[in-house]
Amino acid sequence: MSGRAPFIKPVLEYNEHGWGPCEELSVDVPYQPFCKSDRVGKISDWTAPPTERKFANKYVSSFGNSNQYAYFHEDDESTYHLVDTSGFKGFRPFQRGRFRGNIRNNPRTRGRTGRGGAVTGIGGNQPGVGVNERTKYGKGRDNRRQMGRRFGRNAPTRMRESSVVVRSDWVSIEEIDFPRLLKLSLPNVKEGQDVVTCGSLEYYDKTYDRINVKNERPLLKTDRIIHTLTTTDDPVIRRLSKTIGNIFATDEILATIMCCTRSNYSWDVVFDKVGNKIFLDKRDNAQFDLLTVNETALEPPLDEEGSINSPHSLAMEATLINHNFCQQVLRGGDQKKYQFEEPYPLEESGVDLVSIGYRYKQWDLGNNIILIARCKHNGVLQGPNGEVQFLSIRALNEWDSKASNSLEWRQKLDTQHGAVLASELRNNACKLARWTVESVLSGSDQLKLGYVSRVIPRDHLRHVILRTQQFKPQEFSTQINLSMDNAWGILRCLIDIVMKQPDGKYLLMKDPNKPMVRLYDVPENAFESSDEDDLSDDKLFLLSN
């Protein structure tokens, strides 16, 4: 019995004052962080060498890998430090099949696995092209354009030309990038008040609201004359500048400045400062009145000389389409017209002018800045209650859906007109924003949009009307994310900059290749030509068509 080990009774913790463990715990045991998701097989690492070479650390816990969780039993205050909250990238646990591709959904492996048959491509069978990617001609979708941009290799940047050549004697005053302009805001600008109204408007023909792709109408050419007067050439603005206002402009110029953050092409506006008055004008022989086409598209039209699909040719075509469309949808002839208070100042006997009505409106922008702007309407409409509704009529044009990489209108316009409009908002964001701002400034009740397409893509002279659509300008501006507070803020910022300068002529130009605008101090005779009576081909085009 004496050779046996004595039995020692173990000490049991007994809580006399409650239920559960004792309150006095062992404070000498350091805390070791742990993870409940650690694999149980980790204990086998103690008895045998690891056999995993590729994933040797798959059983390693993600806790305790950093010194921020280490335990130091010291009383030295120098070891006290704050916890790093910048983020800790822990160990990624082992995942089986992590680097394998998705075989089921990978089109490259369908030919090997036998799932998903090969379909016909261009000239024969091509594996890897799904059945849903066929076109109606039996050709597979061409993915060469997408394959050329893999791994972040974007298309080469196109260097655009500026709208005007910057001369060496011009002084740069200010350079403002678009992110700064997008932060500007001028809220609580009240609706403009009418000062003078002149001209006459024809009534809208409601039969054009029933046009669809199957019931298209040809676009007719009109011989009616339209005058594109600048700010300083307008006789009404000259008369008003003597009594009221200190900022004078037209709705096209204001819309260009207000929507400058959406533009990609270069443009310019002239600021003439005389005393405390500023005239916002456009240069003579400039292409300011031409409408851009696919300006904000991912692949804008190529600048090929002599091509009908070059940016300049498309701009001329779009301008002619808008001029003809806004007159064709009106009931002309001997029908009654809506007459404004004053006749058109340039109205002549025997000259057939277009249906257009001008409103010269006044806005108070604060800080003693009174804006006088000429706005316009294209037609009127008899409302359901007999009221008169003013219209702004514009037209979108389709030139070549395959070349522009957009939806084909004749297939989608009747069934998916919302998708067509979304595509146009993406490709022509700046142009649609300008039209919306012009409609809001003039106070139009409706914005009529027409969809005009070529008869065949290779003929840029014959067009057909496929559909019309109408919007309320205020609601449409909300849909396209157009903030009028930001638009007024951009205009007010540029006016304040020019107001601080001495009297003279200044040029605001959109940089052709960078998202910014530049303000230059130019000489008084910077844009004077040898013969001011000569008109450019673009202005003759606008006046004669």
Curated annotation (Swiss-Prot):
Subunit architecture: Component of the eukaryotic translation initiation factor 3 (eIF-3) complex. The eIF-3 complex interacts with pix.
Protein name: Eukaryotic translation initiation factor 3 subunit D-2
High-level lineage: Eukaryota, Metazoa, Ecdysozoa, Arthropoda, Hexapoda
Cellular compartments per GO CC: eukaryotic 43S preinitiation complex; eukaryotic 48S preinitiation complex; eukaryotic translation initiation factor 3 complex
UniProt biased composition (Basic and acidic residues): 133-145
Record carries keyword Cytoplasm: yes
Subcellular location: Cytoplasm
Function comment: mRNA cap-binding component of the eukaryotic translation initiation factor 3 (eIF-3) complex, which is involved in protein synthesis of a specialized repertoire of mRNAs and, together with other initiation factors, stimulates binding of mRNA and methionyl-tRNAi to the 40S ribosome. The eIF-3 complex specifically targets and initiates translation of a subset of mRNAs involved in cell proliferation. In the eIF-3 complex, eif3d specifically recognizes and binds the 7-methylguanosine cap of a subset of mRNAs.
Ranges for region RNA gate: 287-301
Organism, scientific name: Drosophila persimilis (Fruit fly)
Stated family: Belongs to the eIF-3 subunit D family.
GO molecular function, one term: mRNA cap binding
Keyword Methyltransferase in record: no
InterPro entries: eIF3d (IPR007783)
Keywords: Cytoplasm, Initiation factor, Protein biosynthesis, RNA-binding
